[in-house]
């Protein structure tokens, strides 16, 4: 039985019963279901709780808050205070915006209020409470995604209609709840599908990334809502306020009224005085809304003074003090025919005044803040401003055409048309003051009897009307009584006269008009009344309202008309007119009759609708000729606003605002005429000229939706808009769809298609049924031209208006036009002229420089207005950026292939030139005839080049085509002749020899003919060229020198024939030069990074400052012969420029040092190396000998330059000392490598701020170091050594400058590593520095000396860093390393952990397990106590300065002297003894350290090495765990690294615990870890690092370093310039520029001398002809050996003196890259990376 009740039929019947019984439930459900689609900002938090998976508690709190918020919104519909609080926009501005911004910042910092989860009392958790409040509060704000204004209107309408409002609200809430549940269920299904997807489940970290992205999206959406609300309603405090000009005038009038009230006599005396004065009353008006407003101080209801009215004791009314206010004559705007109530304070006649002003003023002061935020009149401006000749002031938004209120009709309350809402409000105030019990008793009996009487009366009137209509039909009269009557407004109860249609508000709007009737004299004579001109009565409603008062002067005397007599006359008149119309017809009737009838009708209606009062009454309006109409004064603001046009025209001279406040339509003022006037001022006796302009305002044709809107007003969102087209400029509503001329999208006109079909049939068919008009060709062309011109004009107007509509478009366009004009005038056209003339020169034709530049000078650019009117430079408009400009080009330049001779041109050509005399410049740099016109065609550079290239080819092609045509014709003739019947021969096989012989003859004949033709053509061309030149010379009448020039020209022509043969090779060389010098450099320039560009600018500025300082120092130094010295320098510079090699087209800043060495080595071979490869290629591959076209002079020149030898064998290189560098660099040159192993060369990134600060502090220290290095000549130790292997198996040389105490950082710092491929095979040889260094320093090194931060670990792929360092002793057996201890610092002695070779780099295997996330900064999570110490470690370096910095305090000074005296080098072979000394010192110093290292524990496991690196990477202390915890702790640390970057790491921790990735036994439960307990238990072993030893040198260095820090980077301290030590034995007779220069310049000088190789007596050290027996192993480059020839000593001194002669350009190349660096100017001879700016990808 229960199941049967749920059958579908029963459910349907139940629903039908509900619908039939009460439709409120259905409508409420429908409305509630619709509200689910009006999505608000609270949905963001609800979706966030569902998607972000914050737990069930958060989800439940979000849903409950959301539902309660929606319930409050539904209750606010029924409950008025909530509706006022939530529906006003003030709540959004004051409450919503701060709350939304707070939520936005709170969601960005999620853990701000997160105090942890408490499972027992979850409601006490603050985070859950915040989720509930967010969903509750944000639900109360207005919706923003889907507009709910239509739904709100439906609710308001239905709430008036339905009786059971509570049932409607509950049903709507239930409907919304159903829709909400369906929405949440659908969202849950989507989320379940996402979670169960296999792809998402397979990726572990995809969910965490998705959560991160969703959190960002929610925060962005929340920020958008904040911005949306902020733009929708302006802020109350920062918006511009209106200047209340009218309020000030109103206040003056009110002050005058108060004075009249205080001096007011009694009513009787006032009447007498007014009668005597003859004062006139113009209008009577009643209470307005502003009278009731508390701010106006008008209300005073005195409860003590009460008086009986009309002799009735039951009804009590308060006594009202009524006064009259005098005012000016102001016209009244008659808009609608409602009760004539004036809302303007000017026209108010009755004002209720207050006695006590003090209390009201206090009340106003208390409510200032409330009115500021919740002001009834609103703080901001209205939306529109209605204004005409009769009316000014902004209209209130609350005002409407009709007012509705609840009134009683037939004993029932119904909505009907009533008076203003202000009067109802005033009536409610009166009712509160009167006793309600007495009022109800008095009105109950009256109301019931009154409604019964009215019902009976209406029935009687209906029956009488029906009888009268039947009688009128029987008589066949066309009268008014025949028609059916309707409800109209009655004017008088006695006469039963009604208002006319013009004054009846219940009729349509079209009848309501303002009509002024001027009564003529003949009509006035016919009227029964005599005093109609002087006396007219006031409106009946005023009399009704004034009848309640006890004032006798307002009693009315009604003059009655006899209705029967007047009605019979009217009926007779109408019947007479109808008969005339029937008999004669409407056409024959005279118009004068109708005109007279209309006047009579109006006059009679006027008589019927007026009531005459007492003639002797002083309040009668005299001398009035207008009919008063019932009108309604619209509520207005007291602001006086003006438009932009009014402000410019200056109509308002008094009380003009500073700025216009109403937005006018977008327009442009076009100046038509300007006049100058002389203004004389009598007071000042000065004459001033004032310019007056006649301006024409041009409005754009496009729609402007902002016109008429007041600045700062609230913008209403446009609704009810229908788009007809894809792109629609104007907004249309569906109501006005019939008025649109445009056709809709899918509109199809059938008639036009039918016409086209029949027209085609008529053309095809022979019949003449359809005659088509035939126009002449001229007429059709004219029409087509007109249509084209019209289309072009329309297009121009549309483009011009489009520029106006786009914001800031005119500014951009005007700037672009100015740029285009300068670019055209000074860049494009001169470059075209240059290109043209260069092509002429290349083609051996005369250039036309003068003619082209003369025409270029004629082109003038004139700035015009936006419409194209030219302007002078003085009268240029100030607002040209906003208004827009045009640029007119007079005599535009056109590039011509040949400038013809100036002959007399025809009239047609002159007319054409005049037409094309000017043009307008477009934005794209093109030319147009008119502004915004389509650009015309013009000859571009490419067209010119194509014309030049293919001009002659076209001529040749035409000639060849003519010849081929002739040949084809001949062949045809021969074929016709030879096409005869040929009998078969007897021999079937003819002889083949004949056929071959004939073919050979034909070929030879063709070839000979072609050669003859070519020779003839060449001779003809020569003759033509010579004749042209001769004619040109004759025309110009050149002197005798022209003959010589002609002869030279003939010689050039002969030489051109030879060059034509060589053109192929010339173009080949030319293309290669362009490619190497132009394209490569341009590609490189485009790849410059921004950071490098900024760094370059900074360094250039620093360099210029440095050079200026050095120049001043050089000037101040004493120089015996400065003039001779400078002259020699200049001479040497000029010679060096001629003979030296320069890098063409390359930016020297980005050339690596190794590349510079390589190029220098190539330069030393020959100065003409640039063309050497091309010439050798030509010689070897094409000719195998010197080409025949080379003259003997050229051959000798090539031989002298060393490009070509007679034997063409392997030439021996010239003698120079840099050969080792060249061969080493040639091995490692990047082009010799394979493409797979080619390095990925990326631009070097700027160093971090930390390293820059260190570099700035170290700069002066490195200057000191460089000074010690360069001034160490007196020592026996050598500075530079070139080391080579004794064996020649591999024929390779490796040059190292390695000291024992050099940190590995110096070698590895400049290795640039790409993210994808860290260490390629091409860097292996370079990395051997590190391996060799590690092997020779006790076979063990500490990881702290290597700067691992240089390597970029941010790769996403697996990295195999094991290839970085190759520990293989076999590869380095042939290399002999020499250590020099004096060049670099000595390192702090520290403990090494293990002696195993794998222990140092084996940690890098953990990089194979790097996941797709970066390695994070782990310095803050483990032990925060070590952060300060770690920062201190960053600042302090691991090594201190070398002993060379402190000469007075050297260790083992005496021992070194004795060794040097006993075992000093005697020759070149003895130079290696210095190496043995340095090795012995190293062994002695490292002995103590090796003993300490043996005592330490060594790591055996890989995990220990990994952990040790991890801890040393991040902390200052060395932390080690016990052996049992190593593996588990490392796994935990890896997971911690992942969790640090996650927003919500809780769930990943849980999943990792389930997977047993994290061991909870290791993690301590306590919140605060105690280090002492961990150390006691043996979990952690903390070993402090031993700090550096503080010797005397160290303290002295610190004191000196403080004074050097504050100096500039390029400055050097003058104290150290005095500490130059010279040997006492040596005497310098010659002035050395080396001693005058600074430290850095000396370094450059020394190395330039080392690079010099121009010595005749030097040994040839070419490896091909090298002999080991003749040459010593260690060659000294700095020439410090005593056993050097005297000749060489003199040569060295000469080189030192004239050092600029040697590689000045090379010095410029090496200046930046090698020595002069911002990071400390380290003395690194090698910069490893080649071409840092190029990028090569595999």
Curated annotation (Swiss-Prot):
Its main location: plastid. One of its GO terms (biological process) is protein transport. It comes from the Eukaryota. InterPro entries: TIC214. Keywords: Membrane, Plastid, Protein transport, Transmembrane, Transmembrane helix, Transport. It is found in: Plastid membrane. The chain crosses the membrane at residues 25-45, 66-86, 89-109, 126-146, 174-194, 210-230, 1059-1079. It is a multi-pass membrane protein. Pfam families: Ycf1. Involved in protein precursor import into plasts. May be part of an intermediate translocation complex acting as a protein-conducting channel at the plastid membrane. Belongs to the TIC214 family. Part of the Tic complex. This is Protein TIC 214. It comes from Epifagus virginiana (Beechdrops).
């Amino acid at each position: 039985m229960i199941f049967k009740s749920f059958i579908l039929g029963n459910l349907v019947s139940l629903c039908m019963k509900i619908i039939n019984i009460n439709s409120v439930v259905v409508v409420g459900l429908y409305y509630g279901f619709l509200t689910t689609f009006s999505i608000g900002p609270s949905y963001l938090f609800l979706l966030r709780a569902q998607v972000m998976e914050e737990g069930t508690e958060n989800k439940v709190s979000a849903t409950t808050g959301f539902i309660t918020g929606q319930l409050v919104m539904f209750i606010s519909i029924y409950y008025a205070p909530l509706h006022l609080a939530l529906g006003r926009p003030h709540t959004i501005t004051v409450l919503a915006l701060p709350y939304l911004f707070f939520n936005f910042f709170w969601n960005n910092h999620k853990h701000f209020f997160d105090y942890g989860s408490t499972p027992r009392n979850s409601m006490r958790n603050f985070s859950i409470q915040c989720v509930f409040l967010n969903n509750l509060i944000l639900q109360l704000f207005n919706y923003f995604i889907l507009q709910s204004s239509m739904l709100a209107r439906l609710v308001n309408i239905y709430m008036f209609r339905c009786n059971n409002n509570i049932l409607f609200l509950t049903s709507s809430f239930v409907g919304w709840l159903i829709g909400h549940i369906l929405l949440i269920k659908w969202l849950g299904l989507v989320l379940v599908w996402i979670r169960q997807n296999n792809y998402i489940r397979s990726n572990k970290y995809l969910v965490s990334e998705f959560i991160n992205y969703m959190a960002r999206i929610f925060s962005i959406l929340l920020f958008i809502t904040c911005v949306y609300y902020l733009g929708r309603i302006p802020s109350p405090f920062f918006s511009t306020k209106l200047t209340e000009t009218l309020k000030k005038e109103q206040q003056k009038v009110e002050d005058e009224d108060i004075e009249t009230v205080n001096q007011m006599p009694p009513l009787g005396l006032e009447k007498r005085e007014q009668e005597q004065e003859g004062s006139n009353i113009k209008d009577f008006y009643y209470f307005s809304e502003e009278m009731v407003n508390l701010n106006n101080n008008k209300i005073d209801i005195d409860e003590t003074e009460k008086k009986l009215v009309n002799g009735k004791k039951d009804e009590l009314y308060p006594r009202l003090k009524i006064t009259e206010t005098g005012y000016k004559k102001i016209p009244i705007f008659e808009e609608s025919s409602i009760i004539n109530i004036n809302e303007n304070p000017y026209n108010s006649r009755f004002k209720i005044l207050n006695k006590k002003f003090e209390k009201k003023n206090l009340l106003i002061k208390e409510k200032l803040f409330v009115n500021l935020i919740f002001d009834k009149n609103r703080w901001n401006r209205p939306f529109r401003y209605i204004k005409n000749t009769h009316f000014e002031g902004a209209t209130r938004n609350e005002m409407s055409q009709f007012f509705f209120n609840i009134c009683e009709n037939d004993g029932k309350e119904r909505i009907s048309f009533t008076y203003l809402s202000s009067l109802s409000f005033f009536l409610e105030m009166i009712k509160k003051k009167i006793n309600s019990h007495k009022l109800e008793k008095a009105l109950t009996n009256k109301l019931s009897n009154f409604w019964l009487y009215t019902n009976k009366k209406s029935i009687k009137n209906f029956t009488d009307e029906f009888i009268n209509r039947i009688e009128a039909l029987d008589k066949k009269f066309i009268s008014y009584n025949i028609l059916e009557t309707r409800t109209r407004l009655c004017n008088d109860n006695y006469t039963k006269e009604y208002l006319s249609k013009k004054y009846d508000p219940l009729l349509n709007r079209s009848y309501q008009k303002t009509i002024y009737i001027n009564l003529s004299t003949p009509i006035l004579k016919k009227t029964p009344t005599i005093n109609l001109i002087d006396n007219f009565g006031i409106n009946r409603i005023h009399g009704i309202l004034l009848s309640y008062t006890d004032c006798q002067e307002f009693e009315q005397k009604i003059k009655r008309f006899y209705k029967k007599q007047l009605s019979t006359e009217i009926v007779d008149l109408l019947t007479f007119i109808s008969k005339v119309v029937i008999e004669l017809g409407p056409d024959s009737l005279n118009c004068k009759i109708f005109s007279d009838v209309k006047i009579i009708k109006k006059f009679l209606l006027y008589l019927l609708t007026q009531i005459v009062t007492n003639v002797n009454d002083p309040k009668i309006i005299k001398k009035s000729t207008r009919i008063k109409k019932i009108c309604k004064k619209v509520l207005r603001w007291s602001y006086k606003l003006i438009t932009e046009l009014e402000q410019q025209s200056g109509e308002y001279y008094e009380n003009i605002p500073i700025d216009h406040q109403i937005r006018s339509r977008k327009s442009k003022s076009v100046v038509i005429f300007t006049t100058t006037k002389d203004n004389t001022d009598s007071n000042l006796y000065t004459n001033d000229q004032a310019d007056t302009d006649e301006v024409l305002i041009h409005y754009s044709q496009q729609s402007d939706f902002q016109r008429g809107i007041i600045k700062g007003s609230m913008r209403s969102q446009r609704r009810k808009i229908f788009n007809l087209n894809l792109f629609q400029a104007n907004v249309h509503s569906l109501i006005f769809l019939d008025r649109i001329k445009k056709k809709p999208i899918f509109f199809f006109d059938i008639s036009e298609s039918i016409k086209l079909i029949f027209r085609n049939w008529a053309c095809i068919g022979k019949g003449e049924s359809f005659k088509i008009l035939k126009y002449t060709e001229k007429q059709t062309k004219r029409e087509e031209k007109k249509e084209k011109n019209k289309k072009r004009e329309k297009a121009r107007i549309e483009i011009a208006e489009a520029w106006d509509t786009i914001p800031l478009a005119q500014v951009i366009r005007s700037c672009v036009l100015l740029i285009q004009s300068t670019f055209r005038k000074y860049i494009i056209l001169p470059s075209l002229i240059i290109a043209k003339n260069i092509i002429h020169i290349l083609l051996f034709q005369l250039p036309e420089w003068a003619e082209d530049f003369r025409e270029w000078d004629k082109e003038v650019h004139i700035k015009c207005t936006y419409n194209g009117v030219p302007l002078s430079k003085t009268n240029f408009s100030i607002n040209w950026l906003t208004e827009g400009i045009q640029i007119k080009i007079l005599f535009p330049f056109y590039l011509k292939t040949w400038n013809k001779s100036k002959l007399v041109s025809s009239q047609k050509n002159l007319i054409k030139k005049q037409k094309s005399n000017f043009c307008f410049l477009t934005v794209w740099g093109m030319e147009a005839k008119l502004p915004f016109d389509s650009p015309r065609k013009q000859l571009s550079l490419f067209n010119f080049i194509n014309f030049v290239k293919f001009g002659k080819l076209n001529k040749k092609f035409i000639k060849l085509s003519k010849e081929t045509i002739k040949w084809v014709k001949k062949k045809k003739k021969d074929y016709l002749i030879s096409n005869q019947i040929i009998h078969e021969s007897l021999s079937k096989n003819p002889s083949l020899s004949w056929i071959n012989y004939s073919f050979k003859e034909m070929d030879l004949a063709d070839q000979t003919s072609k050669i003859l033709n070519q020779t003839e053509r060449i001779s003809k061309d020569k003759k033509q060229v010579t004749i042209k030149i001769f004619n040109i010379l004759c025309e110009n009448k050149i002197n005798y020198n022209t003959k010589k020039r002609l002869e030279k020209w003939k010689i050039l022509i002969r030489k051109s024939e030879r060059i034509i043969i060589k053109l192929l090779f010339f173009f080949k060389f030319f293309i290669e030069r362009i490619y190497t010098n132009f394209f490569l450099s341009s590609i490189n320039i485009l790849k410059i990074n921004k950071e490098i560009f900024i760094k370059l600018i900074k360094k250039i500025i620093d360099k210029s400052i440095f050079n200026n300082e050095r120049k001043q120092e050089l000037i101040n130094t004493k120089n015996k012969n400065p003039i001779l010295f400078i002259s020699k320098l200049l001479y040497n510079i000029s010679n060096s420029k001629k003979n030296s090699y320069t890098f063409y087209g390359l930016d020297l800043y980005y050339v690596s040092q190794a590349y510079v060495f390589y190029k220098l080595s190539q330069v030393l071979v020959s100065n003409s190396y640039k063309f050497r490869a091309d010439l050798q290629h030509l010689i070897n591959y094409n000719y195998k000998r010197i080409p025949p076209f080379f003259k003997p002079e050229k051959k000798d020149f090539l031989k002298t330059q060393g490009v070509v030898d007679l034997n063409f064998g392997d030439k021996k290189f010239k003698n120079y000392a840099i050969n080792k560098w060249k061969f080493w660099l040639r091995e490692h040159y990047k082009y010799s490598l394979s493409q797979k192993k080619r390095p990925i060369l990326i631009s070097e990134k700027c160093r971090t701020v930390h390293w820059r600060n260190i570099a700035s502090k170290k700069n002066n220290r490195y200057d000191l170091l460089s000074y010690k290095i360069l001034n160490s000549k007196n020592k026996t130790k050598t500075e530079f050594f070139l080391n080579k292997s004794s064996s020649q198996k591999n024929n390779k040389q490796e040059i190292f400058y390695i000291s024992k105490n050099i940190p590995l950082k110096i070698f590895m710092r400049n290795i640039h590593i790409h993210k994808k491929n860290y260490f390629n095979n091409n860097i292996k040889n370079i990395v051997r520095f590190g391996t060799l260094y590690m092997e020779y320093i006790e076979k063990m090194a500490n990881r702290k000396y290597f700067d691992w931060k240089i390597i970029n670990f941010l790769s996403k792929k697996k990295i195999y860093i094991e290839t970085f360092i190759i520990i293989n002793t076999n590869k380095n057996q042939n290399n002999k390393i020499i250590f020099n201890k004096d060049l670099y610092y000595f390192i702090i002695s520290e403990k090494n952990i293990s002696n195993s070779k794998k222990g140092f780099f084996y940690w890098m295997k953990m990089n194979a397990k790097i996941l797709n996330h970066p390695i994070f900064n782990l310095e803050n999570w483990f032990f925060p106590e070590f952060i300060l110490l770690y920062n201190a470690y960053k600042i302090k370096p691991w090594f201190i300065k070398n002993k060379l910095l402190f000469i007075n305090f050297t260790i083992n000074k005496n021992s070194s002297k004795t060794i040097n005296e006993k075992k000093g080098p005697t020759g070149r072979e003895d130079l290696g003894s210095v190496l043995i000394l340095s090795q012995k010192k190293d062994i002695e110093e490292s002995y103590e350290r090796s003993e300490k290292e043996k005592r330490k524990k060594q790591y055996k496991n890989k995990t220990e090495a990994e952990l040790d690196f991890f801890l040393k990477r991040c902390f200052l202390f060395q932390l080690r765990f016990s052996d049992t915890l190593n593996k588990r702790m490392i796994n935990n640390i890896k997971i911690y690294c992942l969790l640090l970057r996650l927003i919500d790491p809780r769930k990943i921790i849980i999943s990792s615990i389930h997977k047993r990735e994290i061991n909870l036994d290791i993690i301590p439960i306590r919140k605060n870890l105690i280090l002492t307990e961990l150390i006691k238990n043996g979990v952690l072993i903390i070993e402090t690092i031993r700090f550096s030893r503080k010797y005397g040198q160290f303290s002295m260095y610190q004191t000196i370093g403080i004074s050097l820090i504050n100096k500039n980077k390029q400055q050097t301290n003058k104290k150290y310039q005095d500490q130059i030590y010279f040997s006492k034995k040596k005497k310098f007779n010659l002035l050395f520029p080396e001693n005058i220069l600074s430290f850095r310049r000396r370094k450059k000088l020394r190395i330039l001398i080392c690079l010099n190789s121009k010595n005749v007596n030097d040994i040839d050290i070419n490896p091909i002809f090298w002999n080991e027996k003749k040459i010593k192993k260690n060659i000294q480059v700095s020439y410090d050996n005593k056993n050097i020839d005297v000749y060489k000593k003199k040569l060295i001194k000469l080189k030192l003196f004239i050092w600029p002669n040697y590689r000045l350009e090379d010095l410029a190349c090496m200046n930046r890259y090698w020595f002069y660096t911002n990071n400390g100017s380290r003395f690194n001879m090698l910069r490893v990376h080649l071409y840092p700016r190029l990028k090569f990808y595999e």
